[in-house]
């Protein structure tokens, strides 16, 4: 969610500092952040100090945990949108899938989870496979459903 309105490079360059500031991204710890911890994050010059995004990160972690509890895992939640299939798409930044997931997460109360951010997340975890067939990263035996 920190990427909203910023370049990916800006966020990725701060990844190690975010990881340290956010307790190695331990979801259980992030869920319990209080006003003292939020003030600490807001004063940390090594991360993005946007109050709305910091508050959203704590809020979103709580909703993420609820989804895990409801579905058994966040992966199982995502499978309700994909039927467990890997999707091959190139030259896109959003799709109906990312639109639908974004809308559902927003309905549940998450913030800064627009379709472009969700699409990038789905690419990062391998749900959307975006390597062109002549790319050195393209896998001959991939499990994409629409190549």
Which role does the model predict for each range below?
Residues 1-147:
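HhH-family (HhH-GPD) DNA N-glycosylase catalytic core used in base-excision repair
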């Amino acid at each position: 969610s920190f990427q909203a309105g910023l370049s990916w490079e800006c966020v990725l360059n701060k990844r190690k500092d975010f990881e340290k500031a956010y307790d190695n991204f331990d979801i259980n710890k992030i869920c319990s952040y209080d006003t003292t911890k939020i003030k600490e994050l807001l004063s940390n010059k090594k991360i993005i100090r946007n109050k709305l995004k910091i508050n959203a990160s704590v809020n979103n972690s709580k909703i993420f945990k609820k989804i895990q509890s409801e579905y058994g895992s966040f992966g199982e939640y995502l499978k309700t949108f994909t039927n467990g299939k890997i999707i091959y798409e190139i030259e896109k930044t959003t799709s109906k899938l990312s639109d639908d997931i974004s809308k559902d997460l927003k309905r549940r109360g998450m913030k800064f989870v627009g379709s472009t951010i969700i699409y990038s997340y789905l690419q990062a975890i391998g749900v959307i496979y975006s390597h062109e067939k002549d790319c050195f990263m393209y896998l001959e035996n991939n499990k994409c459903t629409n190549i």
